[in-house]
Every structure is written in C-alpha cells, then in structure tokens.
Curated annotation (Swiss-Prot):
Heme b binds at H89. This is Hemoglobin subunit alpha-1. Hb 1 is a heterotetramer of two alpha-1 and two beta-1 chains. Belongs to the globin family. Red blood cells. Residues 2-143 form the Globin domain.
Length: 143
C-alpha cells in the first residue's frame, strides 16, 4: 500500500493542522495503548508508573509524536530516513513490530476524537496508509 502524491499532501496538511494538539494526541495514544493492550506495559517496566495518563507515559507519548512528525518530513523515503530508529527498536529496545500497528491504531482513534471535522474519510485513509508505511519502515531491521 504505497502513498500517492495526493496521500502525501493530505498527510502533510493534516499534520500541519494537528501540530497545536500533537502532544495531547501522542500522550493519549500511548495511554490508550497501555490500557487497551496491557501486554505493551512490559516495554516500560523500568518506569515507576506505566499506567495510562502517568507522567512517564505522557512524556513518552509526546516523544513518539515528535518521531512521527519527523517521519512526515521524511515521507518520500521512510525506510532510509528512519533506519536508525528501526535499528534502535530492533536491536536495543527489542520491540515486537506488531506494537507499531497497535500504536498506529490508537493514534488514529485519538486524531479522530480531537479533530472530528478535519478527520474526513480521505484524511483517515491517507494517515492510515502513512502510519502503515511508518510501521513497515520501523520494522525494516527486523528482517
């Protein structure tokens, strides 16, 4: 599922609109991830509190959204642009790549909640395809 030039433009435009609330979306998406998929908490066992909405979860959610925004700037070469992040997640953090898809789903839910008018079916499709490509790029070094 490749991204068309229209998809890329839609993603860039939506993420531009979303920038004012990106920290909230990242924090809420990671909070939802650990609530809905509690097995993901195992990656954060070194945190004192990995419960939904806790300070470490919010902080890391914000960090993740920063990475997603970085990926938007590398939308024409996600695999090449995110190679170091792929290596980090594969070799050091050892995150199961299925979790990238789970987090992407949580992000879509949060985006639609925060921007119900702007999150049209066309935006939904484009952002979903982008997050799927992002997940593939992060999983590149697992092969």
């Amino acid at each position: 599922m490749s991204l068309s030039s229209k998809d890329k433009a839609t993603v860039k435009e939506f993420f531009g609109k979303m920038s004012t609330r990106s920290d909230d979306i990242g924090a809420e998406a990671l909070s939802r991830l650990v609530a809905v998929y509690p097995q993901t908490k195992s990656y954060f066992s070194h945190w004192k509190d990995a419960s939904p909405g806790s300070a470490p979860v919010r902080k890391h959610g914000i960090t993740i959204m920063g990475g997603v925004y970085d990926a938007v700037t590398k939308i024409d070469d996600l695999k090449g642009g995110l190679l170091s992040l792929s290596e980090l997640h594969a070799f050091m953090l050892r995150v199961d790549p299925v979790n990238f898809k789970l987090l992407a789903h949580c992000m879509l839910v949060c985006m639609s909640m925060v921007f119900p008018e702007e999150f049209t079916p066309q935006v939904h499709v484009a952002v979903d395809k982008f997050l799927a490509q992002l997940a593939l790029a992060l999983a590149e070094k697992y092969r």
